[in-house]
Amino acid sequence: MTYSKNVFVPVTNICRNRCGYCGFRREPGQPGARLMKPEEILPVLENGAKAGCTEALFTFGEYAEEVSEYRKWLKKLGYSSTLEYLLFLCEASIDIGILPHTNAGIMTRTELKALKPLNASMGLMLESTATLDAHKDCPGKLPELRLNTIREAGKLQIPYTTGLLIGIGEIREDRIESLEAIAGLHREYGHIQEVIIQNFAPKPGTPMENFPAPSIEEIIDTICLARQILPSDIAVQVAPNLIDPKALIAKGVTDLGGISPLTIDWINPEAEWPDIKELQRKLSPILLKERLPIYPQYVRKKWYSDRIGGLIEQLSDTDGYRKKP
């Protein structure tokens, strides 16, 4: 059972999408709306490196530049685009000794190509191939746009994370279709390292706050479907702060994602990360094994640039897992 140790950096929560279930997004002027400054981010990265974290998870609202106030904030920091700022943050992270993993919504091939040399892996939740009410005000949640980003990442040989969000109005057939779409892209490009099966958790103050959470039976069924449909070299992941993983391991879960000893889950701030030692005790006799944000098979295949190669080699053992510090 693998996991990575990360720091979670929510660079901005300004977003052009208005998902019915999202508690992360803010409008400029709302309490908590922000674009994090370098002086806020760099200490998080430095503390993460000291704590033995290997992954900097950079998250963004999607195409925040469509919001004029955000563009002003960015200009004030001295950057002309989100991409330019993100490239700076990735460079800083590498220099500090933490591997970047960027999740910033849909991206063009040009953006992916610019970020590839500075990221150990990247990610985008597919969520669902279905057209859902939850996404009615979300230009970036059109399934074909998301699948295209995942496809372009494959063409560029970027180790990639994607996943399904369960319980947002989709039906079982939609989940099957979503898993088949991911499997098809992986068979073509070989770049999907993990698929997250994430359970929807209702957030107060959102349009879907009274929507029922999916049952454990639905989650188990989806994990079983994932294991049947996805190629065997793709890890199936659940978040241990959102669901108890113990009963799910027998169904095919092989990874617990990024767990942070320092930062909260900014997307699900009500859900605390488990303590890694406590998690190991609960999961015994199954052993937890730490990995990097790039999975061992991609470390061994050297799917990374020279810019991050030295750091990956420094942090990984001969099998491509995290070297014991």
UniProtKB/Swiss-Prot annotation:
The UniProt GO MF terms for this protein read: 4 iron, 4 sulfur cluster binding; 7,8-didemethyl-8-hydroxy-5-deazariboflavin synthase activity; iron ion binding; transferase activity, transferring alkyl or aryl (other than methyl) groups
Q: What class of enzyme is it?
A: lyase
EC number(s) stated in the UniProt entry for this protein: 4.3.1.32
All residue ranges annotated as the Radical SAM core domain in the record: 1-241
State the UniProt keywords alphabetically. 4Fe-4S, Iron, Iron-sulfur, Lyase, Metal-binding, S-adenosyl-L-methionine
Q: In which pathway does it act?
A: Cofactor biosynthesis; coenzyme F0 biosynthesis
> What is catalysed by this protein?
5-amino-5-(4-hydroxybenzyl)-6-(D-ribitylimino)-5,6-dihydrouracil + S-adenosyl-L-methionine = 7,8-didemethyl-8-hydroxy-5-deazariboflavin + 5'-deoxyadenosine + L-methionine + NH4(+) + H(+)
Binding positions for [4Fe-4S] cluster per the UniProt entry = 15, 19, 22
Cofactor comment in the record?
A: Binds 1 [4Fe-4S] cluster. The cluster is coordinated with 3 cysteines and an exchangeable S-adenosyl-L-methionine.
Cofactor(s) recorded for this entry are:
[4Fe-4S] cluster
**Which Pfam families does this entry report, sorted A to Z?**
Radical_SAM
Tree of life domain: Archaea
Is Cytoplasm included in the keywords of this UniProt record?
no
Q: Which family does it belong to?
A: Belongs to the radical SAM superfamily. CofG family.
Q: How does it assemble?
A: Consists of two subunits, CofG and CofH.
Entry function: Catalyzes the radical-mediated synthesis of 7,8-didemethyl-8-hydroxy-5-deazariboflavin from 5-amino-5-(4-hydroxybenzyl)-6-(D-ribitylimino)-5,6-dihydrouracil.
Q: What is this protein called?
A: 7,8-didemethyl-8-hydroxy-5-deazariboflavin synthase
Q: What species was this sequence derived from?
A: Methanosarcina barkeri (strain Fusaro / DSM 804)
